[in-house]
Regions:
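Short Ser/Thr-interspersed hydrophobic loop/turn segments at strand-loop and sheet-helix junctions
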Residues: 38-45
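Cytochrome P450 core scaffold surrounding the K-helix E-X-X-R motif
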Residues: 4-13
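Structured mid-domain segments that build the active-site/substrate or prosthetic-cofactor binding neighborhood
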Residues: 96-97
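Acyl activation and transfer enzymes in specialized metabolism, enriched
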Residues: 30-34, 422-423
């Protein structure tokens, strides 16, 4: 933006005409008057045009004590220590994804940088490691291919389409904060939904699954490269063997297939599962313990029918019931926003507040009327509250964004408890396999030492235990020393590789 530095107008007139006004400028918020404003005044006076077209005004970087970062106070993590322990990408992402790029002050802490590694960098790296592990185990390699019609593949491609589209919009607007949030959200879907739900396909060497994850990582590394330049470079080179992710073209959303109806339904499936798992946690029902039933009431409930099996597995219930009758199991609660009502209604705002408290309001289609006043969308919040049933047998909660409610049967029976114990044994055996450094496809001889009551309890689930742990032989040794804890009960677990 400064023109004197290029000796304008005595030299470089053509260069200046092609480079002014500037595309982008960034300074901390204290330069609003001293720099941003001054540049515009000069440009307007001399050229009758703005000095720049886009601007980021960041906040003040604070130390971990909340005071302004200071060399004399040393109130910040040692930069070289941060780079050595967490990498430069961690610091870069930590700042780009923070509120500092939206003008807020921001305290830099080592804990926050460490969270970046856990929440962003490790999921990306682990996704690549997972693909390479199972592809190599089957002697297969992946390729870019969007042709799979598997429902999970279609879903992750659709989410990838939206990631590319939304991140492109954010980047074009210099909104790095939103770009980071979009990448973080996609990584959560990729690792905690797509990969986890597709594990059996990778175990069996499904080429479509391998190609899909290869394709997703190819596009994802290119999208995230400006934000995480080092780790995306290593993942991309390992994935493709090409020279550099930074020499590739930016992805185009139109090249990626999308099924928006599937996205709506599958996002609802994920909301149902996460809400139900939260209910389990709050009522001390561990995930491996099966429960009798889950009821989902939502206007979109019938669209969930093809995915009932997924919900059943995710939340570990015997039966999923779907209902479009939300009113029968939930009610709406209206909350007005006085700060938004005041400028329009003045002293009548209090009348609306009193009317809402008395229940004198109604919803007519998309319109909400309270105390005789029609409310504007920004003047209220309409929350869906699940009806409270028998607290000993039923747990309920509303879904995000008022999409419906879930009701979970939390009553326990001896049969459910027995299956839960079998699932706990599977978890312990899997941990034992890892400690024995067994390969993911190694078959085993499983030896268990269980108290008599536990052995009788899990006997009907012997085939399940063997299938889940790749055990081709199952033996019992009642006299073996029981040093492993099974929910407070000591048991014995040993594994032997068969091949």
């Amino acid at each position: 933006m400064p023109f004197a530095q290029v000796h304008y107008p005595f030299e470089n007139r053509e260069w200046f005409d092609n480079h002014y006004p500037g595309d982008f400028i960034v300074e901390y918020i204290g330069q609003t008057r001293g720099w941003f404003y001054t540049l515009h005044v000069l440009a307007t006076a001399l050229f009758d045009r703005p000095s720049f077209t886009s601007c980021i005004s960041h906040g003040i970087v604070l130390g971990d004590d909340g005071a302004k970062m200071s060399k004399s106070l040393r109130n910040y993590p040692d930069p070289m220590g941060v780079f050595d322990n967490y990498g430069a990408d961690a610091m870069r992402w930590y700042l780009l994804s923070s509120s500092i790029l939206r003008g807020s002050d921001f305290a830099v802490t080592e804990e926050g940088i460490r969270d970046t590694v856990r929440q962003v960098m490790l999921p990306l790296w682990n996704s690549w490691y997972f693909l390479s592990l199972y592809a190599n185990a089957e002697g297969k390699s992946g390729k870019v291919d969007f042709s799979s019609d598997n429902v999970l593949d279609t879903y992750i491609f659709s989410k990838l389409h939206h990631l590319v589209n939304d991140t492109t919009v954010s980047m074009d607007a210099y909104d790095l904060f939103n770009a980071c949030q979009q990448v973080r959200t996609f990584l959560d879907v990729l690792t905690n939904w797509y990969i986890r739900r597709s594990r059996n396909r990778f175990w069996s060497g499904d080429q479509q699954a391998i190609d899909t994850l290869h394709t997703v990582l190819d596009v994802l590394t290119r999208v995230a490269a400006p934000l995480l330049p080092l780790i995306t470079e290593q993942v991309y080179i390992g994935l493709t063997g090409n020279r550099s992710v930074h020499l590739t073209e930016w992805p185009v959303a139109a090249d990626i297939p999308v099924d928006n109806e599937l996205v709506i339904v599958m996002d609802l499936v994920r909301d149902v599962c996460s809400t139900t798992l939260s209910l389990r946690k709050s009522h001390s029902r561990r995930v491996r313990l099966p429960l009798a039933s889950l009821t989902v009431a939502s206007p979109l409930a019938l669209g969930l029918q093809p995915f009932v099996s997924i919900i059943t597995e995710e939340v570990n219930v015997r039966e999923v019931k779907l209902s479009a009758d939300v009113a029968g199991v939930a009610r709406h609660e209206l909350q007005v926003v006085p700060a938004a009502l005041g400028p329009r209604l003045g002293s009548d705002t209090q009348k609306v507040i009193v009317a809402v408290k008395k229940g004198d309001w109604k919803q007519q289609g998309e319109v909400v009327v309270a105390g005789g006043y029609e409310l504007q969308p920004h003047e209220y919040q309409l929350k869906l509250l699940a009806a409270v049933g028998d607290a000993d047998t039923t747990a309920s909660s509303a879904l995000p964004d008022g999409k419906g409610v879930v009701l979970l049967d939390i009553a326990l029976t001896p049969e459910l408890l027995a299956e839960g114990t079998a699932r706990d044994i599977v978890r312990i055996v899997q941990q034992t396999r890892r400690e024995a450094d067994l390969g993911v496809s190694d078959r085993i001889h499983l030896i268990l030492g269980l108290p008599e009551d536990v052995a009788q309890q899990v006997a009907p689930f012997a085939d399940y235990i063997c299938a889940e742990t790749l055990a081709e032989r199952l033996s019992y040794n009642a006299d073996a020393p029981r040093t492993t804890d099974l929910d407070g009960t000591p048991i014995y677990v040993a594994v032997e590789r068969l091949r």
